[in-house]
Amino acid sequence: MNDFKLKNKWDIPSQSLPIIFIGAGGIIRNAHIPAYKKLSLNIAGVYDLNHETAKTLAKDFNISDVYNNLDDALNNKDVVFDIAVPADQLLPIVQKLPLNSYALLQKPMGSNIQEAEKILKVCRERNITAALNFQLRFSPMMLCLRDAIDKNLLGKIVDIEFHYSYYLPWHLWPFLEEIDRVEIPYNSIHLFDLIRSLFGMPEGVFAYSNTHPKYPNLSDTKTTAILKYRKDLRCALSLNHCYQFGDKNQNANLKVEGTDGVAFITLGSTV
């Protein structure tokens, strides 16, 4: 087992397009921009409903263009629109995207299944090449896991288990208090997407999300779920995002067990 190498990088395209941000919040500042800078991608412009927020982001990261309105921001060709807005704002923006354009859409894909279907329909009608921001499946550790599975290093997969017990600072996103369903669509959807990308669509999903007294205005912050696959494959998720007792015993782990081996993955910083 010391001789094998696992793929841990996604192939970088030979050509890249400038990026324009629609939305200038914490996800863009703390996640997208550092990743783009690491890849030396060109961040060309930014628009946000709060113009001062957009100006501050542009100043902090040397972004050349700050747009006064959405129409000006979308009046660009041969760019990628990185759209990071709350779910209920996604469909109206997608409807305004130029024909034959490219977009990265922040999850979830609308507020409900009806909006998701409309977004898909608009993308097909306007020939928009779009992706949802499900980045976990592309992370180095998950690329290694995928490669190990593809090379049959673990044998037949018989057990998949996510276990999360950590504190998530929900207060950083006050708009979530207005949302009917929070934990899965806005948070753990990444885990469900990863499982689906590795093992295909399950036959069924049994899930229940719970509240926590620390966040009485949030619809839910914890989830227990079972994904139904074949009879000899168990898949379970136990997700507590409101652990209250310090860093020492927090954890965020994935176990994928096969007949010939097992992979244990710790999912980095739990903040």
Segments predicted by a language model, with ranges:
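N-terminal Rossmann-like dinucleotide-binding module
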Residues: 1-61
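Contiguous beta-strand/loop segments that form the cofactor/metal-binding neighborhood of enzyme cores
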Residues: 1-5, 186, 192-270
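Short active-site oxyanion
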Residues: 18, 41-45, 77-81, 182-183
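Aromatic/hydrophobic pocket-lining residues that form π-stacking "cages" and hydrophobic walls in ligand
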Residues: 54, 93, 119, 144-145
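Beta-loop-alpha module in the N-terminal Rossmann-like domain of NAD(P)-dependent dehydrogenases
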Residues: 61, 65-122
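Hydrophobic residues in well-ordered beta-strands that form the structural core
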Residues: 105-106, 130-132, 161, 237, ...
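Rossmann-fold dehydrogenase core element
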Residues: 118-136, 155-162
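Predominantly a Rossmann-like dinucleotide-binding segment in NAD(P)-dependent oxidoreductases
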Residues: 136-216
